[in-house]
Amino acid sequence: MGYTIIWTDKSRKNLEKIPKDTAARIIERVEIIRGDPFLHIDRLAGSSWYKYRVGRYRVILDIKRKTLVIYVIKVGQRKVVYRNLE
């Protein structure tokens, strides 16, 4: 049984600002990690969140192991995605 993926409002808005072909690729790649996300992600330094690399873009994730849920927190280019993370 795989994880459930929940896109936050902020991550959906981030996707709208990205070119459609790139956004589709990001969505497709996030769906791929549903089975076992820990094979593909790295822990975000100084945080309980994780990062997932998709080309020049990064996807910030919050993973709840007990409930098998992946929250997509933020999506953006590497140079700006790490700003203002809370």
What do the predicted segments below correspond to?
Residues 1-2, 12-13, 29-33:
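Short hydrophobic/aromatic-rich motifs at helix boundaries and adjacent loops
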